[in-house]
């Protein structure tokens, strides 16, 4: 057994090892022209080294050999079945991993491992450095506006990356494999998919599990069960495969979708060739087809009924006393007709029934084969071998074909090639051979061809040199090189080989190697050490002695005896093959021994000529420094992380973009954004460890992170940062409550509606000005209370508008009582609503005392609207109403029954309160743009609208709005909290809308009410906006605009355009409402319900216990 002298002091500025029983870890550090290796106990961490440098000592890997987890047979062509990552995880083919993005500031990419391969520099060497990855796209990668960050889109695209870019494993499942989606999404690094995206044709496909496919031929199903896990079909047509088998009624064979028809009456399938006469094409869309039997029976039945109806009409013309006899006679005739019709149908089918006996045997055999196929069907995805699913575990199934054509390119979805674009100039040669863009099949088949060529060149020679490794399962031991062109490489050893033994061998070899003081990279060191280990058949002690014999004198290669290779030949080989010593051996093995080749190479490398030549090669490969988009230095092993040592030398202070923290153990590169303001060169806008964790793993900012995402942080600094964040949040809440209490005690606003009323701390007089009592002012001065305009209006805390959802302080109105934030353009309009008295500029009152601030100074004749990055203090309508009435309780929305916290409210015609977004997205409810106008139409909502159940909160009270696609219902406020899509449907009309003067007949009291009762508003003569909402996982239409999206041909958001153009519709709706009230209705009847609390008989909806809507909403106590 090989052992290392633990008392040897390793040349390092940080670590000295003297304890034999210390658990050790191998540390690899790279400088410009050298690599240093040292051992360190796990409890000691370097200041400039992170966990990503650590190669932990692992025990013998006992691989699981049961089905679905791992199989040792059949082995891959190169025998490499797994790889040990620096964090100790073992990755295998068909595992899902997180991969570093080649672009700094982007989140981790998610991929499936297909195979371990070699790049061109590693061909003919003993090292592997690459991995082939099958990509799974996030919605943001393919420009899909989906809020579910755990949703992925599968693909059949692959690339070859360096193995060092793989960070760790993750979990990816199909949606059908997940029983409880919410519980699954609460787990760390867990994702799911149910669709596939092809980037060459920019098209989405359905992904259906093979275990659920029924509607396919038996031989096709058997082949699918053996070789694939998923089926890729056209989007929206995957459900056809889940139905029962569609076999032809005539020939009993499976019917292809485009070569068969279905009877509209009996629902049976027929081949178009089996029908007599044969059908040349299918019926057009919107038309049905019936078979001959059903068509003839329907025609006979129709003619018989026409005759009987004529007889019945003649009988009704007789006297009244003969009506009963005519009725009995018609009934008897109908009974006789049914008997005759049944006899006719039996005679017609008599010829076909003769062949039933001959077909029963074939039908029974078909059912038995189908039954046996279902029994052999795998019950779950874990029963399938992982290696048999390589390289692809899914394939494309063209439902328009007969599913019998099998080619190698048929498994890819983009088989159809696109002709050359007519916009490109063409020549005579192009006309003979038109250019066609590459499809997925072309790219992947070309990649397969290149991999096969490298395998054919490299694998036979590798096993010829080292025959003892043949037919053995090998594992790759990852060794980070920290070079831009070769980030990491793998040493191949059997899976039962001890990692600790390999660590000891590499460390002792490095101590021997560094005494030569050669400016070589770690790639040469790995090539020599693994060659010596293979020469001694994996004996580390013997390999160490052989390496010593190759370097006699420990740094004096001139003591070599025997033949020497010419320096000119070595120089030419280095220029041709670089530092690949294995290529040297292949070229010179017939002339020189292995020892003589290494002696000659080391002597040439130590000579001045060799040093100069080799230094140029190493400088060209190692002098490149990784940087981000702003030129700041990043780590060589992870371009998404900043190098702290180099950042400190620049004397710049990093600050987190989202949480504004300045303390973090690691700093990550922030995603690039468009900078409108000049950049502060003394600061580095980055992401702290907590924000970087959420962004890199899930691809969204920290503000949208769920508690489960924060609980899944594995790093100790992240957990500590989370506790500090929670403490800071609690402190901010306490400060906010104290500020609200102070503001309520000394409100600084006008009340024009209340003439005189006395409260505890202040008095309202006829001049609509609040006179604060002296004791309140004195207490405020003693406690050094800040003005209300100096609190919570910092630039670091930008507010989010409750109406359009845009974050920013430009033109923002903040209610100083409830904290509701709205933009001035989203709520206050210049055309109407004299709201200058409601606005008090925060900067205008910053230098006033408490007494002076009681009288808001508004310049007469000028509007005090907000400027850029200026926040205005303001009181919303709900808070002003509570102050006028002397109430302290929150108002509740009549549509969702939730309080008015951080959401703008308006009054209704009936005297209730309603959220502005609830009323806007509820159909048949009119929302006026003017603040003083009430909301109309809630009392006219039908009772069934109050009975729908919300998909988010699970309650059935209030009014829910349904999605136009899936029909999912939810309260508008619940949908906003659950990250549903609230937006508008942008509609272009072919005809001009109605006008008030010319088309008065379009009003409701003239008969047509569809265009008036809806929420659609016209933004110009030909376009309109209609509020709609969609679920988080639904496919959005192309004409859908979010609330904060810019409307085409305008510079305003969709919400501001919508609320601005609602005003002209007010007169039409009020006229309609007035006429509808005056219009006579059905005669009044006795009211059956009476409220048990207020004895009221008027309510749009009655709740259990005979409670009216007003009492249920806590409007009457």
UniProtKB/Swiss-Prot annotation:
UniProt zinc finger (C2HC pre-PHD-type) residues: 890-925
Domain (BAH): residue spans on this chain: 89-208
GO BP annotations listed: chromatin remodeling; histone catabolic process
One GO CC term on file: mitotic spindle
Residues in PHD-type zinc fingers: 245-297, 798-882, 948-1002
Cellular location(s): Nucleus
Superkingdom as given in the UniProt entry: Eukaryota
A GO molecular-function descriptor: chromatin binding
Pfam families (alphabetical): BAH, PHD, zf-HC5HC2H_2
Keywords: Metal-binding, Nucleus, Repeat, Zinc, Zinc-finger
Region Disordered, annotated ranges: 361-380
Main location: nucleus
Zn finger residue spans: Phorbol-ester/DAG-type: 227-282
Keyword Transmembrane helix: no
Listed SUPFAM superfamilies: FYVE/PHD zinc finger
Subunit structure: Component of the Lid2 complex composed of ash2, jmj3, lid2, sdc1 and snt2.
Protein name per its UniProtKB record: Lid2 complex component snt2
UniProt source species: Schizosaccharomyces pombe (strain 972 / ATCC 24843) (Fission yeast)
Gene behind the chain: snt2
